[in-house]
Amino acid sequence: MGWWGWAAAAAAAAAWVAVKVLEVLWWRPRRVEEHFARQGITGPRYRFLVGCVREMVALMVAASAKPMPPPYRSHNVLPRVLAFYHHWKKIYGSTFLIWFGPTPRLAIADPELIREVLLARADRFDRYESHPMVRQLEGEGLVSLRGDKWAHHRRVLTPAFHMDNLRLLLPCVGMTVLDMADKWRAMAEADKSGEVEIDVSDWFQVVTEDAITRTAFGRSYEDGKVVFKLQAQLMAFASEAFRKVFIPGYRFLPTKKNTSSWKLDKEIRKNLVTLIGRRQEAGDDEKLDGCAKDLLGLMINAAASSNGGKRSALPVSPITVNDIVEECKTFFFAGKQTTSNLLTWAIVVLAMHPEWQERARQEVLDVCGADGVPSREQLAKLKTLGMILNETLRLYPPAVATVRRAKADVELGGYLRIPRDTELLIPIMAVHHDARLWGPDAAQFNPARFAGGVARAARHPAAFIPFGLGARMCIGQNLAILEAKLTVAVILHRFEFRLSARYVHAPTVLMLLHPQYGAPIVFRPRSSSQPTCEKMNPLTSS
């Protein structure tokens, strides 16, 4: 073949690549826009390669620059937290099309459509592929797995989160909470004002980290603490890097923080592999008398069964050491952040609404008596506190949105035709704040709406989805609620509290919902007569 032959072949190859690129970046987006336009669904126009990302970022940045104005009686935070959704909903309605690069995302807020996507027709949808930087942080465990492998891991891990198993962990969690309360009291008594200002968002990270470590590692708790301290450092680096996620190729640049992040990730993996090896050599028995089943033990036993013992009926590959490492990382990120954020917002809203703070405190005093530390049975009787936590989750859900991807062409609601590979954006916070579902006081803090239970709180059962819905519902929700109830009950019994003058109400999203400027709260001990954690063993009385 002469030079002209090679030139012709190269030209043909270049033309083929150009056609494929144009198909993905231009022709397909145009066809998708036309497809939804014929159904009466529009949105901001697709821009070549970048989609709507620039507009989304600009709207979010502008919203996050302005805190909520005091006094903080309204919780209408949706325009700040999901600024792009709030802005475009006013223009295009509650169902509209946006573009994450060349990928179409259809925003849906109708609870009946959401129920179909997450529950009735969940087999037609996958969790979308998250950004590699997010996967480094959250691990490639249960949250991001799909298909048979996800189902296998879910079945293996579920026993660790059964209520009877979690109750075995509560005494240890209670000791951690009491230790925190003792430190707060000592700090307040050391100040001549008799009060202390605490940024609860920082302290609750420590409390939830302890519970997560015990649930994940059980009798390997001390070794697990070392691993999760490294994971906390990695979270700090990754969270900062995530702010630059829209800079192409940023995660590959050998910056000082990226290099530190890579080293930490390697060290975490090395320590976890060593810990797993020790447990395997020791012969892990998940049924030790009086001990809770832990995530690590369940995974090791499942790996042993699939590699030489009982075989799974599912056509999945065996659980490997790397799978166990990823599940530990996932559980630390998802569990720690979800519970600490719930605790933070619960204390913030109770500080904003002293009338509900007093009602909850009176319930704790009536149910728990002088000790103020609820037993296993008493936790179930704290109905008002449960209502407050549900209302907190409604107004300030940990994840403000979730995304699913259509695995094939699908029709929803008998009228909405969705092409394959379209992503569906479910704006959880928008659904939680919808006055059509929750009434005219949807932006107000009113725990009484949950007095008849979650099912009767709104006009549709899928209107309240802080932990998701269906088979992929958060596996750790029972742990989060139990830990939050226990922690808030102890705080209510021992302290009165209010917002610090320095508090700025600025909910913002960095993967999960958190207070942009922290959560400084002023605590005043109620009396000096409550027992300290050295004087009592919590959660043993009935």
From Swiss-Prot:
One example GO MF annotation: oxidoreductase activity, acting on paired donors, with incorporation or reduction of molecular oxygen
Entry protein name: Cytochrome P450 734A6
GO cellular component, one term: membrane
Domain of life: Eukaryota
Anything else known: Plants overexpressing CYP734A6 show a dwarf phenotype, characterized by abnormal leaves with stiff, tortuous blades, undeveloped leaf sheaths, no flowering and bear seeds. Over-expression of CYP734A6 causes an important reduction of the levels of the BRs castasterone (CS), 6-deoxocastasterone (6-deoxoCS) and 6-deoxotyphasterol (6-deoxoTY).
SUPFAM superfamilies: Cytochrome P450
Protein's membrane topology: Single-pass membrane protein
Family: Belongs to the cytochrome P450 family.
GO biological process, one term: brassinosteroid metabolic process
Cofactor: heme
Gene field: CYP734A6
Organism: Oryza sativa subsp. japonica
Induction profile: By brassinolide (BL).
InterPro entries associated with the record: Cyt_P450, Cyt_P450_CS, Cyt_P450_E_grp-I, Cyt_P450_sf, Cytochrome_P450_Monooxygen
EC number: 1.14.-.-
TM segment ranges: 2-22
Enzyme class of the recorded protein, top EC level: oxidoreductase
Subcellular compartments: Membrane
Tissue occurrence: Highly expressed in leaf sheaths. Expressed in roots, shoot apex, leaf blades, internodes and panicles.
A Pfam family of this chain: p450
Keywords, ordered alphabetically: Growth regulation, Heme, Iron, Membrane, Metal-binding, Monooxygenase, Oxidoreductase, Transmembrane, Transmembrane helix
Residues that bind heme: C474
Described function: Cytochrome P450 involved in brassinosteroids (BRs) inactivation and regulation of BRs homeostasis. Is a multifunctional and multisubstrate enzyme that controls the endogenous bioactive BR content both by direct inactivation of castasterone (CS) and by decreasing the levels of BR precursors. Catalyzes the oxidation of carbon 22 hydroxylated BR intermediates to produce C26 oxidized metabolites.
